[in-house]
Curated annotation (Swiss-Prot):
HAMAP family: UPF0340
Protein name: UPF0340 protein llmg_0465
Matching InterPro entries: Antibiotic_NAT-like, DUF436
Similarity remark: Belongs to the UPF0340 family.
Length: 180
Protein backbone atom coordinates (compact mmCIF):
# COMPACT_ATOMS: atom_id res chain seq x y z
CA UNK A 1 0.00 0.00 0.00
CA UNK A 2 1.22 3.49 -0.89
CA UNK A 3 1.41 5.17 2.53
CA UNK A 4 1.95 8.66 1.07
CA UNK A 5 -1.24 8.33 -0.99
CA UNK A 6 -3.04 7.01 2.11
CA UNK A 7 -1.89 10.08 4.04
CA UNK A 8 -3.17 12.44 1.33
CA UNK A 9 -6.54 10.65 1.05
CA UNK A 10 -6.98 10.64 4.83
CA UNK A 11 -6.36 14.40 4.92
CA UNK A 12 -8.97 15.00 2.22
CA UNK A 13 -11.54 12.90 4.09
CA UNK A 14 -10.96 14.42 7.53
CA UNK A 15 -11.03 17.97 6.16
CA UNK A 16 -14.33 17.25 4.42
CA UNK A 17 -15.90 15.53 7.43
CA UNK A 18 -14.91 18.36 9.77
CA UNK A 19 -16.47 20.87 7.40
CA UNK A 20 -19.70 18.88 7.12
CA UNK A 21 -20.03 18.11 10.84
CA UNK A 22 -19.24 21.68 11.96
CA UNK A 23 -17.60 20.29 15.11
CA UNK A 24 -16.13 22.98 17.35
CA UNK A 25 -13.06 23.46 19.49
CA UNK A 26 -13.41 21.66 22.82
CA UNK A 27 -15.76 19.01 21.45
CA UNK A 28 -15.06 15.29 21.04
CA UNK A 29 -14.58 13.44 17.75
CA UNK A 30 -14.55 9.63 17.71
CA UNK A 31 -12.55 7.57 15.22
CA UNK A 32 -13.30 3.95 14.42
CA UNK A 33 -10.59 2.38 12.26
CA UNK A 34 -10.02 -1.05 10.76
CA UNK A 35 -6.57 -1.08 9.20
CA UNK A 36 -7.42 -4.60 8.03
CA UNK A 37 -10.24 -3.22 5.88
CA UNK A 38 -8.06 -0.36 4.61
CA UNK A 39 -5.50 -3.02 3.66
CA UNK A 40 -8.17 -4.93 1.69
CA UNK A 41 -8.71 -7.62 4.32
CA UNK A 42 -11.46 -8.63 6.71
CA UNK A 43 -11.90 -6.51 9.83
CA UNK A 44 -9.68 -7.77 12.65
CA UNK A 45 -7.69 -10.20 10.50
CA UNK A 46 -4.94 -8.16 8.80
CA UNK A 47 -4.08 -5.33 11.19
CA UNK A 48 -1.30 -2.99 10.09
CA UNK A 49 0.58 -0.79 12.55
CA UNK A 50 1.90 1.32 9.66
CA UNK A 51 -1.57 2.02 8.27
CA UNK A 52 -2.88 2.86 11.74
CA UNK A 53 0.03 5.22 12.34
CA UNK A 54 -0.48 7.09 9.07
CA UNK A 55 -4.24 7.54 9.47
CA UNK A 56 -4.24 8.43 13.17
CA UNK A 57 -1.30 10.83 12.78
CA UNK A 58 -3.12 12.82 10.10
CA UNK A 59 -6.42 12.91 12.00
CA UNK A 60 -4.80 13.66 15.37
CA UNK A 61 -2.81 16.61 13.99
CA UNK A 62 -5.81 18.03 12.13
CA UNK A 63 -8.07 17.82 15.19
CA UNK A 64 -5.39 19.07 17.61
CA UNK A 65 -4.78 22.12 15.43
CA UNK A 66 -8.49 22.95 15.80
CA UNK A 67 -8.69 22.23 19.55
CA UNK A 68 -10.90 19.17 19.03
CA UNK A 69 -10.41 16.10 21.22
CA UNK A 70 -9.82 12.74 19.51
CA UNK A 71 -11.24 9.51 20.93
CA UNK A 72 -10.07 6.32 19.21
CA UNK A 73 -12.37 3.32 19.46
CA UNK A 74 -10.90 -0.10 20.28
CA UNK A 75 -11.90 -3.32 18.62
CA UNK A 76 -14.45 -5.70 20.13
CA UNK A 77 -11.74 -7.49 22.14
CA UNK A 78 -11.58 -4.43 24.39
CA UNK A 79 -15.37 -3.96 24.25
CA UNK A 80 -14.98 -0.93 21.98
CA UNK A 81 -13.36 1.08 24.78
CA UNK A 82 -11.97 4.46 23.82
CA UNK A 83 -8.47 5.85 24.06
CA UNK A 84 -8.50 9.53 24.99
CA UNK A 85 -6.30 12.11 26.67
CA UNK A 86 -6.41 11.93 30.47
CA UNK A 87 -7.25 15.66 30.50
CA UNK A 88 -10.51 14.92 28.67
CA UNK A 89 -11.41 12.03 30.99
CA UNK A 90 -10.89 14.33 33.98
CA UNK A 91 -12.82 17.20 32.39
CA UNK A 92 -15.82 15.00 31.53
CA UNK A 93 -15.54 12.80 34.65
CA UNK A 94 -15.38 9.65 32.50
CA UNK A 95 -14.29 6.55 34.37
CA UNK A 96 -10.83 5.32 33.41
CA UNK A 97 -10.26 1.58 32.91
CA UNK A 98 -6.93 -0.25 32.90
CA UNK A 99 -5.63 -1.67 29.64
CA UNK A 100 -2.82 -0.90 27.22
CA UNK A 101 -3.86 -1.38 23.58
CA UNK A 102 -2.08 -3.94 21.43
CA UNK A 103 -2.25 -4.51 17.68
CA UNK A 104 -4.72 -7.41 18.08
CA UNK A 105 -6.43 -6.17 21.25
CA UNK A 106 -7.39 -2.57 20.72
CA UNK A 107 -6.22 -2.25 17.15
CA UNK A 108 -3.74 -0.29 15.09
CA UNK A 109 -5.56 3.01 15.58
CA UNK A 110 -5.39 2.75 19.35
CA UNK A 111 -1.76 1.65 19.29
CA UNK A 112 -0.90 4.70 17.16
CA UNK A 113 -2.90 7.06 19.37
CA UNK A 114 -1.29 5.60 22.50
CA UNK A 115 2.07 6.66 21.10
CA UNK A 116 0.87 10.11 19.98
CA UNK A 117 -1.18 11.22 22.99
CA UNK A 118 0.49 13.11 25.85
CA UNK A 119 -1.24 11.13 28.60
CA UNK A 120 -3.39 8.36 27.07
CA UNK A 121 -6.08 6.57 29.06
CA UNK A 122 -8.90 4.16 28.22
CA UNK A 123 -12.54 4.76 29.08
CA UNK A 124 -15.56 2.57 28.38
CA UNK A 125 -18.10 5.22 27.45
CA UNK A 126 -18.05 8.68 25.91
CA UNK A 127 -20.45 11.05 24.21
CA UNK A 128 -18.85 12.52 21.08
CA UNK A 129 -20.37 15.23 18.91
CA UNK A 130 -19.20 13.63 15.66
CA UNK A 131 -17.09 10.85 14.29
CA UNK A 132 -15.49 9.04 11.38
CA UNK A 133 -15.85 5.31 10.73
CA UNK A 134 -13.20 3.75 8.49
CA UNK A 135 -14.01 0.11 7.83
CA UNK A 136 -17.53 -0.30 9.29
CA UNK A 137 -16.42 -0.40 12.93
CA UNK A 138 -19.78 0.82 14.32
CA UNK A 139 -19.04 4.12 16.08
CA UNK A 140 -22.70 5.05 16.55
CA UNK A 141 -22.78 3.98 20.19
CA UNK A 142 -20.31 6.76 21.01
CA UNK A 143 -22.02 9.66 19.21
CA UNK A 144 -24.55 11.90 20.93
CA UNK A 145 -28.23 11.61 20.05
CA UNK A 146 -29.62 12.63 17.56
CA UNK A 147 -27.15 11.17 15.08
CA UNK A 148 -27.12 12.33 11.49
CA UNK A 149 -25.25 10.43 8.75
CA UNK A 150 -22.58 12.38 6.89
CA UNK A 151 -21.45 11.32 3.43
CA UNK A 152 -17.70 11.94 3.13
CA UNK A 153 -16.23 13.16 -0.14
CA UNK A 154 -14.62 9.71 -0.55
CA UNK A 155 -16.64 6.58 0.17
CA UNK A 156 -13.53 4.43 0.53
CA UNK A 157 -10.06 4.66 2.01
CA UNK A 158 -7.96 1.87 0.56
CA UNK A 159 -10.33 -1.10 0.72
CA UNK A 160 -12.38 0.27 3.64
CA UNK A 161 -15.87 1.70 3.46
CA UNK A 162 -15.96 5.21 4.99
CA UNK A 163 -18.91 6.83 6.77
CA UNK A 164 -19.32 9.58 9.33
CA UNK A 165 -21.81 10.92 11.85
CA UNK A 166 -22.67 14.26 13.34
CA UNK A 167 -25.25 15.07 15.98
CA UNK A 168 -27.89 17.65 16.73
CA UNK A 169 -30.07 18.43 19.74
CA UNK A 170 -33.40 16.60 19.94
CA UNK A 171 -36.36 18.56 18.57
CA UNK A 172 -39.07 18.58 21.24
CA UNK A 173 -42.40 20.33 21.70
CA UNK A 174 -44.47 19.33 18.68
CA UNK A 175 -46.27 21.63 16.27
CA UNK A 176 -46.32 24.68 18.59
CA UNK A 177 -42.57 24.69 19.05
CA UNK A 178 -40.09 26.69 17.04
CA UNK A 179 -36.57 25.44 16.43
CA UNK A 180 -34.79 28.44 14.87
Amino acid sequence: MDLEKLKEETQIIIDDVLKQTEIKSGQVFVLGLSSSEVNGGLIGHASSAEIGQVIVSVIHKTLSDKGIYLAVQACEHLNRALLIEEELADKKDWEIVSVVPQLHAGGSGQVAAYQLFKSPVEVEHIVAQAGLDIGDTSIGMHVKHVQIPVRPISKELGGAHVTALKSRPKLIGGERARYE
